[in-house]
Regions:
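Kelch-like beta-propeller repeat domains
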Residues: 1-198
Length: 198
C-alpha cells in the first residue's frame, strides 16, 4: 500500500493503488517526479524489479515495472539519488550473500554494475550521501562502515562499530548519526564523523 502523509492535518491519505505484487524490505526513492521501489521479498523469493509510479498522473496512474536488474534479486540495501543518477543495490541476495551496486540515469531502464566492490563488504542496511565529500557512507550487517567516493570511484574501509541486528544512518547539518537496533540488547545511537576515522 502506498499512502501520502499531509503535515497540515497530520493524516495519511490512501490515494495510490497497491503495487502489482506484495513485497516488503524493498528500497524506495524519488527521481524526476516519480516514486520508485526496487527489489524486496515476498517471503519466498527476492525480487529484481524496479517499479515506478508517475506522480504527474497521480489521479489515474498505476505502478509499472520499468526494469529488471540482472543478478540483482535482493531485499534491503540502499538507494541514493545524486544529481541526475541513481545508485542502488548492496542488499541481500540470499543467505547473507551481498548483491552488487548499480548506477543508472534518465529512464532507469538500463543499470550498470559498479566494479571493484571489496570482497569483505557485507550486506548494506543503511547509508547516507555526504555532498561535501562526494561520498556515500554505509554500514554493513557486521557493523563495518564503508565509504564509496564518486570522484575517485574508490571504496575505503572505515571503523568497525558494534554488531547489532540492523542499522539506520541519518545525516543532519553535516553530521552522520547511526542507530543500531537489536531485540536482545539495548539500542545504540552515536554520531559518526569521517574526519576522526582515518
Amino acid at each position: 500500500e502506498c499512502q501520502v502523509y499531509t503535515s497540515e492535518n497530520n493524516s495519511w491519505l490512501f490515494e495510490f493503488p497497491s503495487l502489482p505484487k506484495g513485497r516488503f524490505n524493498s528500497v524506495c526513492f524519488v527521481y524526476r517526479d516519480s516514486l520508485y521501489v526496487f527489489g524486496g521479498t515476498d517471503n519466498s523469493s527476492n525480487m529484481n524489479e524496479i517499479v515506478r509510479y508517475d506522480l504527474s498522473t497521480q489521479n489515474s496512474g498505476e505502478w509499472t515495472t520499468i526494469a529488471k536488474v540482472n543478478e540483482a534479486n535482493q531485499r534491503g540495501g540502499v538507494a541514493f539519488v545524486v544529481e541526475d543518477k541513481v545508485y542502488a543495490g548492496l542488499g541481500e541476495k540470499s543467505n547473507g550473500i551481498r548483491n552488487g551496486f548499480y548506477v543508472s540515469s534518465d529512464s532507469l531502464t538500463k543499470w550498470e554494475l559498479i566494479p571493484s566492490i571489496p570482497a569483505q563488504l557485507g550486506v548494506i542496511s543503511s547509508g547516507v550521501y555526504d555532498e561535501q565529500k562526494k561520498s556515500f557512507f554505509m554500514i554493513d550487517n557486521d557493523g563495518k562502515i564503508w565509504e564509496y567516493n564518486l570522484t575517485t570511484e574508490q571504496w575505503t574501509s572505515r571503523s568497525l562499530w558494534i554488531r547489532m541486528k540492523n542499522y539506520h544512518m541519518f545525516m543532519l547539518d553535516g553530521s552522520i548519526y547511526i542507530l543500531g537496533q537489536d531485540i536482545y540488547q539495548k539500542n545504540k545511537f552515536t554520531v559518526y564523523n569521517p574526519i576522526w576515522d582515518n
